[in-house]
Amino acid sequence: MTTSESSSTSSVKIYFRLLSYVRPHVGIFLLSIIGFVIFASTQPMLAGILKYFVDGLTNPEAVLFPNVPYLRELQLLQAVPLLIVLIAAWQGLGSFLGNYFLAKVSLGLVHDLRVELFNKLLVLPNRYFDTTNSGHLISRITFNVTMVTGAATDAIKVVIREGLTVVFLFIYLLMMNWKLTLVMLAILPLIAVMVGSASKKFRKQSKKIQVAMGDVTHVASETIQGYRVVRSFGGESYEQNRFAQASDSNTRKQLRMTKTGAIYTPMLQLVIYSAMAVLMFLVLFLRGDATAGDLVAYITAAGLLPKPIRQLSEVSSTIQKGVAGAESIFEQLDVEEEVDTGTIERDRVTGHLEVKNLSFFYPQTERQVLNDISFSAAPGQMIALVGRSGSGKSTLANLIPRFYGHEMGNILLDGVEINDYRLRNLRKHIAQVNQNVTLFNDTIANNIAYGDLAGAPRADIEAAAADAYAKEFIDQLPQGFDTQVGENGVLLSGGQRQRLAIARALLKNAPLLILDEATSALDTESERHIQAALDHVMKGRTTLVIAHRLSTIEKADMILVMDAGQIVERGTHTELLAQNGYYARLHAMGLDEPSPVGAV
């Protein structure tokens, strides 16, 4: 099979998969088809009525239906105007049914695709987000889905309505003069070749447009999210140029596709009207005993063909845009979800954590991030991880809730390998607070009682906020716990946002607590309050702390000093200071990043 044949087969498969999304709306879709059948049937009727109109010019008193009871007295003078009104009403009914119900199908399909895409995002593995541009992800949900909808509904509308129009007109023409009509059919192979050639170009250009649109979304998203950095470092000109380049690239690709259509459509029209010219010559040359009305009706019906044929040829552009968009959408929908082969579920674990000979490589890289890590933590113990950036602390913390899967070594929770737990059940037992706090554009109460915590009693929410020393600033807000925090908590200070994240973790009341630089954004007074709250909440819970501040880790039952993915020292704060090694140097520098072990 050649590359072009393979690509054509792939396009057909993608398109039929796309059409499968119409299935839930098949009842409404059938109503729209009925409407388009009604609409298409009126086209030969309009041509036919002209026959009687022209014949009526010479004999207006002739009857229209001489052999039909009750209508045999109806003269052309009366019948032609009446039939025109009836045909127009019939056409209007078909147009309404077709357009309205197809619009319902279209909007339903947009909704279904967007929801499925978004739901898929929620179950994709972390590595997918690490390697995929966020702007492209957003563009698929917004821009690509719209293009796909055009292929699945608007294109079908044209194919059905204009296709049936062509069929009905050809049937009418064959009934009037089949020999002349066969002459017209001779141009169809040429039209098919032209449509096929244009389709390949449209699909290729559509893919490029989608990538360019994703780049536009990505640049805009990055700039909006990082607007403080942009302004602080005078990056306005740089971002303006970057966005202008992305937008210009998208514009040029759009123009290239428009140019293809602008060249292709007139060429197709030239072919069709050339065939019409030949047909008119033959009609005049071979008129035989046909009446003037017959000739006018035939020419009119033939003259109605170019418009639907042209629209059918142009629908290729819409379909290829949709196929290109659907390809990227289905690629995302087909990505393997987070691996969850576990079968064990427990209502509550004690929090006994044990790591044995754990090594880890990030997917698709050769760089070893963790090397033969082993330690254990009993319930109620606090384990602190310290070391310079890139030493593997956060990676280790991300492996415990299975944000990434490990293959070398073991991580045991209550003596059970974490891969043997059902993923949702495992994460139910873990509360995590990161340095980069995520808050949603909702109320303070809803941000604390988020996800599985939604519906928690207000008293529990307020108690968690009080334990995190967040209630003191919440009570000062105009609407208290019902205050909107803005996008990602933009209306709150860094310390306030961090305290809300800690309150969320406290409300979860999980037996395993992971604090990844959780107090780094707090001022000294807030940190003192939080430390007191954490001392209370860590009782009976296993706590894994990653921190740069001495006050956060001095009380740890065990400190693991990490460098280059290995544990280079372990012990209590006092024991490690006595060793006068790597940790002692960290301590002397206030837990800033020293040079690596072995450096002079």
From Swiss-Prot:
Naturally occurring in which organism (per UniProt): Pseudomonas savastanoi pv. phaseolicola (strain 1448A / Race 6)
Function: Involved in lipopolysaccharide (LPS) biosynthesis. Translocates lipid A-core from the inner to the outer leaflet of the inner membrane. Transmembrane domains (TMD) form a pore in the inner membrane and the ATP-binding domain (NBD) is responsible for energy generation.
Membrane topology: Multi-pass membrane protein
Highest taxon, organism lineage: Bacteria
Location within or outside the cell: Cell inner membrane
Keywords: ATP-binding, Cell inner membrane, Cell membrane, Lipid transport, Membrane, Nucleotide-binding, Translocase, Transmembrane, Transmembrane helix, Transport
Name of the coding gene: msbA
Enzyme class, spelled out: translocase
SMART domains: AAA
Name under which the protein is recorded: ATP-dependent lipid A-core flippase
Keyword Transport: yes
UniProt GO MF annotations: ABC-type oligopeptide transporter activity; ATP binding; ATP hydrolysis activity; ATPase-coupled lipid transmembrane transporter activity
